[in-house]
């Protein structure tokens, strides 16, 4: 297929996919669960106002939001899902009170009698009592009484009740002794929990399925998997098999266009780095340090799972609570991975064009300072927010937004977007001379610029929701950032960069690389753009979103099935000629990326991808398995590989200390594999069994998670964590050793 036809196909995929994505974004807005004006009882008593719910959402976000447990399944894993937890406790109290109304003790009743009260419970909680004319939700006096009791329970939990029961529970949840100081804020957060759980159990108008597609699984209240989950899960598997067959046929009948005669020496050996290319060295140094800090924060966060109020006896909750350590751990992962790729772009652009624009080094240095300011400022702001030193409005702008992966305050988001636009400007001005030549590189250059544009501007999706935007809408835009920005266009960018590198090394023909990259981008984006919806199955979205997410996210797995071919191709390149040995470890990172793409994104990703699977598994440790294996295993190791390619060009005259970088490489990969498979995966499997057998709330409960064997399995991640941590430390030592000498082993 010619590049021209591939461009038409790519344009069609992008336009159609974003058209559908936008249309159903409007559909989510149209059908989202209502924010009531107030919640009242049948006798007219006001339980809480609608504004209390919105303010309560901000209160929850200010204590860490999705880094302190989760709501609707999105968030952290140590504390419970508050919507599921509230629902379960509400159901228990209602059953008890319904039986007491008849002079009976529910717990001592036979199963047949309990079933009668469970029917009454479902009639009570599943009926949609929202009045569209008045905007009011109506509770029965009994349910209102339960809501008040639950408000008192959560007040004891978050305001620091010192009774042994709540001290123990806070430790199990890794909560601060006093997550909140203000009782009024606690009332508002309880109202938010009540509304979030109401959304999970209340039937959509005209249906017998809740706003969240009956998530979370809880048979007691009638939350069981609806028919649509089974149907679209089956359809997604059929789509996967069909498209895999088509892709296998395409590869089988395609001929590999290999380079006939390989260069006898390194084509890049004589290239002298320009001043702006040399200026990217400090980016790599800072990224390596951020990797270390992020690793330490990850270890602290993981330890909170076994010792919820301290670190080996040290009371660090007082100054580094779990909400902060986890926020920093996740945020730094995004920032260092993104920065490594941005630095690669700044290094590659002048190398591709052969031109150093005037003041390019100044621009690279200014951008470095700006990014450093955003990183430090956002982390400090998050600490002030979680420690309750900011008001709700100030917290939104400067502190902690409460949404995973976009925790940083809105001001820092805006400044980061400005930095990305500056990066785009620096990229384009360096590439313009190459574009003007209109040679055989133009197709890859055009795709390079398109990917750069997407990286700069798609981050703006994180600005599309406000401080009190409905969570269904905020989740929609949040996943634009996480799925499309991080997982989507950064991957396209990396594919183009890798193609340029291999072409410049003389290992690939530019024509075949162009066709391969365009085809890969079409395949990837065909499933990837609309695959965004698979994150939104249970985020109060309509069934059509579930159907699209299941179908198109299955297509994301299709190219991963044949990724072994890419790994083998990269391995062959690493052995193709003597001088390529200098690029062994960057290429090995690409091979490792292929492995983790298959295992982390492919196997572990598809394990939780079908709606019927995610219905039981959302927010369990199975999600953490996929997250670590895919985010660090794929994007992190790819970022490390790209940095090593840049370092090879920045220090062209020296052989590397293979023992040092090789040990780092293998320890990082083996450590990650052990951490994921020996500890996190077994916990996820045990949780999955509990969620399927009993209910979702039980799989997240302190009673289940604090069992002795669960504690033992959590401790079993130590060997993997240690290997990974030492490997990352050795990587940093190697990177700085290229500058200071200990990573050099003579001249080339």
Map each language-model feature to its residues.
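Membrane-interfacial, low-structure loops and terminal tails that flank and connect transmembrane helices
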Residues: 256-280, 436-438, 573-583
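Non-cytosolic membrane-interface motifs at loop->transmembrane helix junctions
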Residues: 402-410, 473-483, 541-552, 618-624
């Amino acid at each position: 297929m010619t590049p021209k036809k591939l461009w038409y196909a790519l344009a069609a995929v992008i336009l159609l996919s974003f058209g559908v994505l936008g249309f159903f974004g409007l559909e989510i807005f149209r059908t989202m669960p209502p924010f009531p004006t107030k919640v009242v009882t049948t006798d007219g008593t006001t339980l809480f106002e609608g504004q209390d719910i919105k303010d309560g959402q901000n209160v929850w976000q200010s204590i860490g939001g999705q880094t302190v447990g989760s709501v609707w399944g999105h968030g952290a894993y140590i504390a419970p899902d508050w919507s599921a937890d509230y629902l379960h406790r509400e159901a228990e109290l209602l059953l008890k009170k319904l039986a007491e109304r008849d002079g009976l003790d529910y717990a001592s009743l036979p199963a047949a009698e309990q079933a009668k009260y469970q029917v009454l419970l479902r009639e009570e909680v599943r009926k949609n009592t929202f009045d569209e004319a008045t905007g009011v939700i109506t509770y029965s006096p009994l349910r209102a009484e339960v809501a008040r009791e639950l408000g008192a329970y959560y007040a004891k939990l978050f305001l620091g009740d010192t009774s042994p029961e709540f001290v123990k529970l806070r430790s199990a949840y890794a909560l601060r002794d006093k997550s909140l100081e203000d009782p009024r804020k606690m009332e508002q957060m309880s109202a938010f929990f009540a509304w979030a759980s109401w959304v999970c159990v209340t039937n959509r108008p005209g249906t017998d399925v809740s706003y969240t597609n009956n998530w979370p699984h809880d048979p007691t209240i009638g939350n069981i998997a609806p028919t649509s989950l089974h149907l679209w899960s089956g359809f997604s598997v059929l789509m996967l098999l069909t498209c895999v067959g088509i892709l296998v046929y395409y590869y089988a009948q395609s001929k590999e266009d290999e380079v006939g005669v390989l260069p006898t020496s390194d084509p890049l050996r004589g290239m002298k780095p320009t001043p702006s290319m040399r200026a990217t060295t400090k980016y790599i140094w800072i990224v390596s340090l951020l990797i270390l800090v992020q690793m330490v924060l990850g270890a602290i966060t993981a330890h909170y799972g076994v010792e919820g109020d301290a670190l080996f006896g040290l009371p660090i909750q007082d100054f580094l609570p779990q909400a902060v350590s986890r926020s920093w751990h996740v945020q730094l992962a995004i920032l260092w991975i993104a920065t490594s790729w941005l630095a690669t772009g700044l290094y590659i652009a002048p190398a591709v064009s052969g031109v150093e624009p005037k003041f390019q080094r100044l621009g690279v240095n200014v951008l470095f300072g700006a990014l450093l300011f955003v990183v430090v400022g956002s982390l400090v702001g998050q600490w002030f927010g979680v420690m309750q030193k900011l008001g709700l409005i100030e917290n939104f702008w400067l502190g902690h937004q409460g949404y995973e992966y976009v925790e940083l305050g809105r001001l820092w988001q805006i400044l980061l977007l400005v930095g990305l636009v500056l990066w785009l400007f620096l990229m384009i001005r360096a590439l313009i001379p190459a574009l003007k030549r209109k040679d055989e590189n133009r197709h890859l250059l055009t795709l390079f610029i398109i990917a750069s544009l997407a990286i700069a501007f798609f981050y703006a999706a994180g600005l599309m929701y406000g401080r009190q935007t409905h969570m269904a809408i905020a989740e929609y835009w949040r996943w634009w950032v996480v799925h499309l920005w991080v997982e989507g266009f950064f991957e396209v960018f990396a594919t183009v960069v890798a193609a340029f590198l291999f072409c410049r090394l003389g290992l690939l023909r530019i024509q075949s690389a162009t066709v391969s990259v365009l085809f890969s981008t079409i395949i990837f984006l065909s499933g990837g753009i609309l695959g965004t919806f698979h994150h939104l199955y249970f985020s109060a979205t309509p069934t059509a979103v579930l159907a699209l997410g299941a179908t198109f996210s299955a297509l994301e797995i299709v190219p991963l099935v044949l990724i072994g071919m890419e790994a083998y191709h990269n391995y062959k390149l690493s052995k193709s000629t003597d001088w390529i040995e200098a690029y062994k470890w960057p290429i090995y990172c690409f091979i490792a990326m292929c492995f983790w793409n298959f295992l982390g994104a492919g196997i572990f990703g598809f394990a939780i991808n079908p709606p019927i699977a995610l219905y039981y598994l959302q927010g369990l440790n199975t999600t953490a398995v996929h997250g670590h294996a895919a985010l660090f295993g794929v994007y992190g190791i790819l970022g490390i590989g790209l940095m090593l390619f840049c370092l090879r060009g920045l220090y062209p005259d020296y052989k590397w200390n293979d023992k040092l970088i090789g040990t780092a490489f293998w320890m990082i990969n083996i450590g990650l594999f052990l951490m994921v498979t020996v500890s996190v995966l077994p916990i996820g499997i045990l949780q999955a069994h509990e969620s399927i057998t009993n209910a979702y709330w039980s799989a997240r409960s302190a009673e289940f998670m604090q069992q002795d064997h669960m504690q033992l399995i959590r401790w079993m991640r130590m060997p993997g964590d240690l290997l990974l941590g030492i490997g990352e430390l050795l990587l940093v030592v190697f990177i700085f050793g290229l500058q200071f000498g200990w990573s050099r082993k003579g001249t080339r």
